[in-house]
């Protein structure tokens, strides 16, 4: 697998470069870095840092693979028109070499409450926009359902408060409210 690593790394590097040129990606990264100072959500993007990509450690990559790419830490999702018995047999055969092993639970220092507004400015070629973020509880918390209901009242593409009062009255080109909840926050 590692023999094709460098060609894959080039593709990942190109994806990282695209994100560095994207105002939206820069805004999202800045938002998460401010909301999650302790959690990995705000420490780096999924694709990693430029430094990680410049100096990859094959030893660390192999270690990560061996620790986390285990059957009890993954799922196989299939869709389409196929014979389930045949496909399950193929999946079983393809992954039969893998053995279950304990996977350490992710731990992190809880975030401190946000006590004052945080303002970050991102510069780039895109049109000006405002992004506001709020740290919510994890996706298993019932308050997240309330946050999603508020989102739908604000914007739903047709008759949300922001849709009617800002977009349809042409006060703004676009306005949206989104809930982006993850496991821990």
Question: What positions do the PLM features span?
Answer:
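Carbohydrate-associated surface elements
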Residues: 81
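Short amphipathic alpha-helices in soluble, non-transmembrane regions
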Residues: 89-94
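Short beta-strands and strand-coil junctions in structured, solvent-facing domains, enriched
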Residues: 1-2, 84-85, 137-141
């Amino acid at each position: 697998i590692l023999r094709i690593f460098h060609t894959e790394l080039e593709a990942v590097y190109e994806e990282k470069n695209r994100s560095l040129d994207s105002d939206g990606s820069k805004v999202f990264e800045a938002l998460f870095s401010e909301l999650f100072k302790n959690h990995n959500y705000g420490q780096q993007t999924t694709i990693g840092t430029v430094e990680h990509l410049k100096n990859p450690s094959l030893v660390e990559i192999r270690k990560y693979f061996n620790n986390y790419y285990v059957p009890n830490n993954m799922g196989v999702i299939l869709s389409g028109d196929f014979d389930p018995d045949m496909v399950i047999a193929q999946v079983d055969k393809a992954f039969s070499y893998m053995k279950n092993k304990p996977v350490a639970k992710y731990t992190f220092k809880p975030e401190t409450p946000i006590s004052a507004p945080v303002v970050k400015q991102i510069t780039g070629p895109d049109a000006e926009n405002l992004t506001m973020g709020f740290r919510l509880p994890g996706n298993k918390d019932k308050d997240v359902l309330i946050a999603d209901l508020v989102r739908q009242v604000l914007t739903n593409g047709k008759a949300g408060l922001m849709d009617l009062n800002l977009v349809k009255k042409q006060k703004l080109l676009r306005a949206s409210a989104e809930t982006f909840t993850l496991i821990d926050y």
